[in-house]
Amino acid sequence: MLLASREIRRAPVRFGLLAGAIGLLIFLVFFQQTLLSALLNSFTGALQNQSGTVLVFSSEARENVEASVLSPDIVAKVAAVPGVGQAGPLGVATLTFLARGQQVDLAVIGAEPGKPGQPTKLISGRPATAAGEGVASAEAQGLAIGDTVTTAAGRSPVTIVGLTEQSQLSVLPTLFVAYATYMTLRKAANPDATAVLASAVAVIPSSGVSQQAVAASINATVPGVAALTRSEAVANAPGVSSTKGSIAIVLALAVVVVALVTGFFFLILTVQKTASLTLLRAVGAPASYLVRGLFHQVTLVLGVALLIAVGLLLAATATANAGLPLTIEPRALLTSTVVIVGLSLLGVAFSVWRVLRIEPVQAVSRPGLGGIE
């Protein structure tokens, strides 16, 4: 350990550049992972962060909440299924509003006050409980508590009484309102509509009943519907699986590159100092001591690289665009860190093999080491 640490102190530029290069690569992995989380939130954050743990769609909607239509009769049948504790209609639509003199598109989500479907990430203000009140997602730039928005025609005003976070839907900021307000907004946008139907039913199971059991019971009891747990509804939403798959490939390649860069650097370093390592073996240093020194250097370099990566990630998230807020998820970063460190240590396995192959007798068989030719 002493010799390994001394080598780093004698060549700080070499090891510093390596730590910086690996740190940039790890930052790339962390940033892409954070970006993936932000993108998924922008697609389905409003579904993920609402209080209903089971969502019921029309079976013809292919798990797309904006394409789903359910009649009041279906909503009542779902609420009557054994195991359903609470249930309420959920309306979802994209509408154009006037806010501070400018047009803005918002995903409107209507739920009956006190029933499932309420936003769970409220950061300020209060829930919308009365007609004409709304809770806007923080991604709706320029909207603040006390502001009033109207439909594009200047009708049906909605006053913002609260703000929520991580609640976008289909990459649009959201406006949570009471279901009665949702119906009013839909009629104002389409005066010729004869009725406003629910898009889904948000359900909370009875105490002691699992989400999966309630979803299965609804599917077996009510024809023409598809009941999914909240996590299933989020995973099956349009665009989610393709986004996950694309970024997962890039993440995997970046992790492999980090491991290869670390492994190749220490392999080159080991080859360059083979003569010194051979002398150490000749004077009695065990191979295990040299291997421990190698892993000590790798651990120090990776530790510094991780600090650099985390620092860059904090700076990037602090300056992110409000339209796509980046939130660091410690659990995901910890998982990535374990994978990166594990693969990097595996990447230096060839260097370890080189060290273990060094025999003390080579010190007396190499002229360059003072041995006999």
Predicted feature locations:
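Hydrophobic, regular-secondary-structure patches
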Residues: 26-105
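Short helix-loop junctions at transmembrane helix boundaries
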Residues: 292-293, 297-345, 349-366, 370
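N-terminal Sec/SRP start-transfer signal
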Residues: 1-29, 40, 357, 368-373
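Membrane interfacial helix motifs at helix-loop boundaries and amphipathic/re-entrant anchors
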Residues: 35-45, 49, 64, 230-250, ...
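Mechanotransmission and gating elements of multispan inner-membrane complexes involved in transport
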Residues: 163-254
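Hydrophobic secondary-structure segments that place a key small or acidic residue at a functional site
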Residues: 90-93, 99-112, 118-188
